[in-house]
Amino acid sequence: MTITNIDLNKENTIISIKTIKLHDSNRNTDAILKVTAPMDWNNAPVILFAHGFGSSLDGYGPLADFWARHGFVVIRPTFLDSRTVNLDSDDPRQPYIWKHRVQDMKLILDQLDTIEDYLPGDHYHLDRSKIATAGHSFGGQTAGNLLGLQVLDLNTQKREDLSDSRVKGGILIATAGEGGDNLTEFAKENFSFLNPSFSNMSKPALVIAGDQDHNPLTVQGPEWMMEPYHLSPGPKSLLTLYGAEHSLGGIAGYEVKETTDENPERVRLIQEVTWAYFRHLLDIEHDSWKQVQSSLANKDNAMGYIESKE
């Protein structure tokens, strides 16, 4: 029985392959990533996932494993801000760490053939026509860049379009809103890249936010995490989760220390909602998403609610 009353497809045995290395002469070091996929599949849809600040390819198992068990190939890179990379604070790449993340995502899209070569057997094929993205926290901004989100460069006072036509849309989870006066002094001094604009983020997206996500980087409250929905053009949907803090019940990993609001039922809800949305977004089928919207249409629902705009 599912929380949202959707009919999940057959659960697959999954495989995970790491560490896959992609060479990029502009990066100084190889990009590394992990692929989690159904054991028995061909021509599968792809989810390109961006981890939060400091995390790595080993994070977010509760999401990646679920998506893979139910038909998606999930690709998780490790970005330069990861604690496992331990980039020096004076490294010249630090001020543009946000942009290096986006470049890594595009590198993966450029080298899908190489990734396929790492997979066992001859039958594995990635469906290039069905690619979506997702990210949590800082990773939501990274995913959003592929959808049209633009970051203000404080040195040039310009914004750059880094959207990618290969990506159909995505999911932004607990993602920061606009910067400027919304930021604390600490955030202004240490995270200058938290200056996104959502006005050009025109691709379809689902935004997920917790109504108890009090982020220390902003002078606003949890509504800051809802700005990617409210300040962007449609089509968009917003899932507001009651009682959820930044880890939204435990999506960042199994038994991870950073989870402050452990709630397996909430994680299960997010798994179901995101799976249904990806199926809708990539035109696999639409009944599951319609059922999710119906189940969470009432604000009196115990766990949260969904609203949408076109």
Features from the language model and the residues they span:
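Short beta-strand element of the alpha/beta-hydrolase
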Residues: 43-52
